[in-house]
Amino acid sequence: MTVTTSAPSGGGEAAVPPEDLVTLTIDGAELSVPKGTLVIRAAEQLGIEIPRFCDHPLLDPAGACRQCIVEVEGQRKPMASCTITCTDGMVVKTHLTSPVAEKAQHGVMELLLINHPLDCPVCDKGGECPLQNQAMSHGNAESRFEGRKRTYEKPVPISTQVLLDRERCVLCARCTRFSNQVAGDPMIELVERGALQQVGTGEGDPFESYFSGNTIQICPVGALTSAAYRFRSRPFDLVSSPSVCEHCSGGCATRTDHRRGKVMRRLAADDPEVNEEWMCDKGRFAFRYAQLKDRLDVPLVRNAEGVLEAASWPEALEAAARGLTAARSRAGVLTGGRLTVEDAYAYSKFARVALDTNDIDFRARVHSGEEADFLASRVAGRGRDLDGTGVTYTSLEKAPAVLLVGFESEEEAPGVFLRLRKAWRKHKQRVYALATHATRGLEKAGGTLLPAAPGTETEWLDALASGVGLEDSGTAAAQALRAEGAVIVVGERLAAVAGGLTAAVRASAATGARLVWIPRRAGERGAVEVGALPSLLPGGRPATDPRAREEVAAVWGLAELPARYGRDTHQIIEAAATGELSALVVAGVEPADLPDPARAREALDSVGFLVSLELRPSEVTERADVVLPVAAVAEKPGTFLNWEGRVRFFDAALKPEQMTRRLAPTDTRVLHMLADAMDVHLGLPDLRTTRAEIDRLGAWDGPRASEPAESANALPRPAAGEAVLAGHRLLLDQGVLQEGDEALAGTRHAAHARLSSATAAEAGVADGEILTVTGPRGTVGLPLRITDMPDRVVWLPLNSVGGGVASDTGATPGSLVRIGPAARAEEALEEVEA
């Protein structure tokens, strides 16, 4: 038999030319593979499974466990198939045809089991353990070992969520290689030598990596286990359901394991085109928010005494319908960025059909009219599964150069960070970032900082476009962006910079680099597509275009749609606070997420009628007139559209028949029932109908919205004792979807303020001391970390423990704040109160 293989499928790569192929024989079967292919991979292509522990297709070869030994003709001894590459004319015999290879593998297995404990009945890995399986298939029937097994103290917590059992470890180095190579976090290593060798961490240096959970999943023997899952269940007790992560716009494929109606754990699924086999710890561990005891399970209605009390669904829907009908054309809808495509579409339709308004916006964050124009002209209707264009994970990894603007990959889209780091390791991709300082994520991706104070991004982008007025690193970046395949990545934070997105479009046109927008939340890309914006209808249709409105009205069975350009989130909040709007429908939005939380709370207190669709009690439900519980991601089917424009469908992991409690309906179902109660036909009773209607509308084929055309604002000029505020959210912060997992919370990065050395000296604060930052509404104090960054700029994590910047200070990035030592904090606070 002769087999010829070319490039791996799924990547869209051309076939390997014949001169780049080598031909070898494995167990009598001849095959041709690309040069550089490992023998163990070539055997897999023939369906031959060579036992292994250390080998992993996404890690560099190590040859640590020696379990994959094969016989190679012409070699003096058996060789590890995971480390040798195929050569022309090579003849390989595996354990299936070679007594030498079989004996060697049996011997290695016998040695591995000498000190391995008999923990299988209680080990979390039992039932899905490669060592257990291969001991049965490739081990001796009896052990010759009669001594006492080596023991260690166990388990050893190497972080709050990863526990180490050294007795079980076979020193495969999968965990250490992943941490070093893939995540760039060399926080665990193999220490000691010989018989004393073991996995360890530095003294007082815990394993605080955003990707530590991957080491648990790829450990082949249960030496690394999850603190939250340990001894909770056995693999054969679990039902596994494919799903998609709901935490960021990456769209990572996951596997949800559940038992008796309760999610027990979540694992990374294998998707070579998206997350490969990895996921961040937030996606892996942050699912318990839906299982907390305060979960809403019945509707609530505010009674005549002003107290929320439980109500039946008909009662709650009638109360909500009565209030919203009275406010028709004077109501706003805030949806947040976490909704599925179908749910976001339902809100978009509900706003126009039931409330007769375009006052709807998903952007519970800093936003602008310039961003709305950018999304309408450059994002809507474009992407991998929309029009077949756009940047993907694969093209981002292959790009010769990438510029990040208003985007921190490790904190805001960890899957993107892993691809950037992989690209730097494999082919020295050049990564540049317009930011205040070099973040850990940028350093781990081999990136170069282009130091930019808040507001100067527009000037930087124009300079990169023209190639004029740049210093060495800027000149190199401008040249790199002109290489074929280069990419400019803009994040949602660039919306805070006047002219920033306009300049990004100009830079893309001038350099030829492809432009891609990567938001932070999972539902934002889909919300753009279904018209959860004041300026857009579904399919990228401009809300002010008569033909666009006619198309949508025809599908929705209406005579006409509202023609007025709607209010954005900021304007909706202002209108609610001043009484211009008399009702709000709020879904999954926290005031703390908004640029001005205090004003948002005033609006919620002032608005005449408030309906909240939520999972758990929040600041919004506390103020709501009607609270309607909705389903969590694990409890419903749906679709996310990731930043690539790739459709990510998932089914419900938890089904009604598995539950001991009644599952809440989806947002779409609730809005359908609410519209019925308002005597309005929404026509979205289920997912299938909703999906079909979205497909029927399709993409807009008319003229697109105009490109953004915003100019830069005058930059603030801080005096002594002042600074321009900069900041972004950390991956693990005080977000409500992270609640319920104390082990995960224990790995949050400590919150610090950052200043340049000159600014710190001017402010009278030394490294490690408390720096106070005072805005228009209050003060926050954090330990100072002196950093190489522009002068008179202060960087703060925006929503970390000890530093809810917008809530505590009333300041937003780009604004002026006062800075000083802790001793001046009370004085500054008194001035604010005065």
Regions found by a protein language model. Give the residues of each.
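Short alpha-helices
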Residues: 436-437, 443-473, 500-506, 635, ...
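Acidic, Ser/Thr-rich peripheral helices and adjacent loops at domain boundaries
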Residues: 449-454, 533-545, 627-637
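A glycine-rich, hydrophobic/aromatic-adjacent loop/helix-cap motif
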Residues: 487-571, 577
